[in-house]
From Swiss-Prot:
Family indicated by similarity: Belongs to the GTP cyclohydrolase I family. QueF type 2 subfamily.
Top enzyme class: oxidoreductase
Organism superkingdom: Bacteria
Record field: catalytic activity: 7-aminomethyl-7-carbaguanine + 2 NADP(+) = 7-cyano-7-deazaguanine + 2 NADPH + 3 H(+)
GO biological process: queuosine biosynthetic process; tRNA modification
Catalytic center residues: C177, D184
Protein name: NADPH-dependent 7-cyano-7-deazaguanine reductase
Annotated NADPH binding sites: S81, K82, R245, G246
Amino acid sequence: MSVEQSLLGKETQYPTSYQPDVLFPIARAQSREKYAHIEGITQGKDWWHVFEISWLNAHGIPQVAIGRITLPASSPNLIESKSLKLYFNSLNFTQFDSTQSFIETVEKDLSAAAGAKVELTLFQVDDLEISKPQGICIDDLMPERLEQHPDATLLKLDESDEEIEVELYSHLLRSNCPVTGQPDWGTVFIRFKGKKPCYRSILAYIISYRQHNGFHEQCVEQIFADIWQNLQPEKLMVYATYTRRGGLDINPCRVSDLTWMPKPIRLARQ
């Protein structure tokens, strides 16, 4: 299905009965065509936090939780966010015999939409803790050049020719939803092993996304691919934690080496 057929940016009625068919898959293949040869572009996970989960227990009493969805980057489809919100709304008045029954139903429906096994972990509403970023924040550096759209030529190696392993992060990631034009804000983590990159050039590159139209997952994959091709690290991880919209936040992560998969976190802006 094409994104133009989705419910993004359109007035919709919120379902009050279970409707798994509202889920809208979007194929990953088209946006990945020019990165198909990049090692790691399909390695990783998309973590979603769902803050508006509710269903009825066997006695008809409302239950609430925070959910973490884990969707493999190797899945043929991602799931459009508004359709996911509507799907969870459709469960608000549906009775389940147990919490496990609720989890199994959601996992079955999301796996069918994604075309791969999707996992749901539930947290009590007070239990999903806020983490602090680890690594070197590059936001106070001064880039040599600024662009308003992604420009891989901004990426440079440091003049020292030093071999390093480092984790950098920036809170300055901004891009736009390709359908509604609404801004998406995020923190991006970059773990890098290889010849030392110029940190100012990486910041300039991140800033260049400010007027770019792309889904969260696509932006992370483009960042990963551009760094991989232009800075040629031995190992690379790119992980973005986007702020919440409509009760959901999306956190894509791509890695060249599966041993570099981080644990999912939740930051203060989420």
